[in-house]
């Protein structure tokens, strides 16, 4: 969306749109038609439409009555019921519109050419539309409805075209612009169908459409995805959105290219070219060819998926496979959350899109699944396609780029049923995020509901709620869906409402930011797409933002600076939106402002580069388009290095947050923040960085703050930023010096938030939103300008209080404390690193280059370098985990390598961040590169890919170091031989701890993550590591887990030189996540482990944080101090061996006990843990089966009893009717006398009560049983406690155990109720006959 908006596309649309605002957003393809059709309101309305039209229950058009109304009208027509028909009619209308507005089409075309965004818009739109529909899909639909509606709008036409490829193609083709406009109209309809495909967003898109009606009901389908997709749509818009082919025919070539990304989804064939030709004919025949792929829904879908998997889409060409892996990691992290919630974390984008305007929504539509897809599609049409496929494959289990739905229920899109997404979402993130879609959706709902008006007010924020993560986070959101699902989603979703509000704000803000981001992203992606597949991959995680970040990172230095300048004016927009809270109004204003700003920006930046904008984007023109695109980029532009750092951090964070939603939101917020506080570009940039970090982590929080503060304090950028970003703001205030400070502050704040965030991207995002808001506010109040460290700590405590409580209390609290610790440590470290970091940046950059090979590490590193301290902190902030990892890297590296370690640490942080997104493929290498000692065996799939990043860590790359214990679990877990690692750490002790921790723990961590039991706790960052939100997403979680372990490690070793740092953060947070694996109660010995930090072994001292998931008993290999190294590979062989080795080796610093514990949680422990997890999974599945069977039996029994009751009642009524009046009265008297205390009715009530009690008891028992097996501690978890009251939600949100418990409880309740009913009936019957 941003892309579109930013791109010329937006401009052209602008003319049509008239109102700068909407057009800006809508601008892309849609804008023209929309502008024409909807005009300024088009965007808003569209947005609204999404909200209202979609019928999203929550978003009633009501939200934005003014704008909505138009949209509503259109959408209204295309309400769910009409959905497809309406959609088609709309599409047809659109066609006529297109015809009428050939200009729009032309504009579209120009746009599309000038900017991928345009292409994206249309191209994605089709998918998007599908997405939109999906978006509109239910719960999310509501949230995403806003977005969806936008998407819908934008993709409606397209969507239909695409969705009902055969039918719609013609329509879509009808005009990219028209399509867009139609999309607005059809969006509602489209959004419905979106939902189905929301799951596989684009691929599904088609079937979805086909099924979309059926799925439409499924509205659960994450609208987030589509929202994100919309972004892609924007990019594809030129391509007619591929499906639209002609729809965005204008951007035919681009569109076509964009389209390609869609090819990713393997099952996109549904949208066959058949439809396309028609549309294309209507639109541009030429586009057809370009959009042929699109035409063949395979390509189209692929593209969409690619877009969804921004990474794949983006850099599929470049990093076809690797990147995909990264994407996978990112996605996985986001659960392909970002793609899913991330990708529906991308949902975050969805919100973003709305924020920006309809345009973004268009993009978002596609974006949902491939937020970055928009960008991606625009950027790497061809590559995306492969990528998508790869990505699908990549996504560990989500071959289809499964959106992370936040539910444990299998997600069904058309013919496709996704059972696996859940775990991904647990990874969460993220994005994570993916798919935090459910989460995002909920948030979206909440946001929509809360911000129904907010949706409008928030501009696209209401849709933004979509995020995640995903929305990843969502943004963000989506990530959370799966990745964070355990924490964020399950817990979060349990907390969903609180966080939803946060998310809503966040998302909305994200939406705004995201919109800008989206704009930026597509550009960035374009640049990045080819240049940095890696970005793409991470983008996959932070689908939406990541590309932005990456692109920005890559181009940031080049373009960002320009972008910032160009966008400076626009930036204020977000700031201009003072009503963050009053989303409805504020959103409207914000939207207008944002759109206007975007428009201005486009005019300023985009117009000039309008035609060449595309080239600019790809080349470096990003600055122009990118600037326009990157509203927030403006800030980036100013402090390019900072921004890049920020962006990189963002990217990292995005990548890192397993849930895309959080990332996206974070990134988006950052952009919004940047836009808002863009007054001083440089300051803004810093703010941006801070905000980005904060944003990303708090993406939601900062934005809420930012928008409000921005508006209020736009003049006072610093203040606004401070308030918004709290610590970030502080940095912003002290722009240049604060860069470090800001970074540090950011890191600190983010750490507080981000720490949790990375683990639970979504959860964190949501959580952080509140905490950040609170923290930011507190920090701001406490003295936003106060020392960053101070601000960060303040923020963190606030975060802790707010965050922990609001989100999964335990995980967040756990995380928060860790965050605090980490923040403090990091702050300390940052201060050290700050000193080092300034110098380090070059080194980091160099490292970054090395890292880049890994994945955008270069950019990330650059950012990290630029923000060495920031990196540690920011990353921490962005990714508490990453920060921890960074801290660990920094600390460990510092300790081990001294000054170099700072750079290395930064690098590692970056790597960690990046790796998290790439968790599977690159995580390890990143980490490896980052910290010599801290290198974790992140590269789960790709062991030590990062190795090359750091020459010093090259050895780490050595495969020898990593032993994949494939036997342990389906996931090969690294059993890194500590002995192998010695090279990694200059300081044996520190290194060892780090290594072991990094290696063993990290690997274990990853393994654990995979297992859902991120149990790596660094001594210091143990608590951070705790946020095992990662556990939720098995595959995607990988990254997250990586992040966590990194964080843990990072914190643990963060001080590097400061052994004191070893906080031995208690990993014992009872972070019981929905996923049994997830809850590794962080109460690992690590906590107790004070981490005797030896000078030589800083905090590395025995990291007894063999955190074993209570659920999985995963004994993380505690990081014993440097002596760990002595461990022989055999240790991996057996726990006992490990224990013995640990005992024998005993860290010099760590006590023998530590060593023992450490060894206990050695690699062997990991293997054992993996096995345990496997066993748990098996038990869980068996339990689930048994429960289901039992439920079925109970249902049967209940039905039998009901039949009996009915029969008896019937008999009774017959008897009564036949009884003489006297007898009846007599009988009644007898009944009264016979059962005065309990009339049937009265009796039933007590029976029910009793039933409830037993149900609760049964639930407790069940949970205990499940908990015992899964060691989830569900029985004692709040969720379980709550389950009785909220069984439906609880079951879905809590782990399978919780679900089982819930099921059992339900069964019991039903049974008891039935029995009670039977008893009551029998009483009546007995009495009746008695008389």
UniProtKB/Swiss-Prot annotation:
Keywords assigned by UniProt, alphabetized: Cytoplasm, Nucleus, Transcription, Transcription regulation
Domain of life: Eukaryota
Signal sequence region: none
Region (Leucine-zipper) residue spans: 1194-1215
Composition-biased stretches (Basic residues): 191-212
Biased composition (Polar residues): 13-31, 263-273, 432-443, 740-750, 917-933
Gene Ontology cellular-component terms listed: cytosol; nucleus
Entry-linked PROSITE patterns: TSC22
Transmembrane parts of this sequence: none
InterPro entries per record: TSC22/Bun (IPR000580), TSC22/BUN_CS (IPR047862)
An example molecular function term from Gene Ontology annotations: protein homodimerization activity
Region (Disordered): 1-35, 101-317, 429-471, 553-582, 597-665, 681-750, 814-853, 908-950
Biased composition range(s): Low complexity: 106-165, 175-190, 553-580, 614-641, 701-734
Acidic residues bias (residue ranges): 285-294
Biased composition annotated in UniProt, kind: Gly residues: 236-248
Any one GO biological process: negative regulation of cell fate specification
Protein location: Cytoplasm; Nucleus
Compositional bias annotation for Basic and acidic residues: 295-306
Family: Belongs to the TSC-22/Dip/Bun family.
UniProt-listed PANTHER family: TSC22 DOMAIN FAMILY PROTEIN 1 (PTHR46745:SF1)
Function: Probable transcription factor required for peripheral nervous system morphogenesis, eye development and oogenesis. May be required for the transmission of the dpp signal and for a morphogenetic movement of the medulla in the brain that reorients the second optic lobe relative to the first. Plays a role in determining proper dorsal cell fates leading to the formation of the dorsal appendages.
Protein name: Protein bunched, class 2/F/G isoform
Gene source species: Drosophila melanogaster
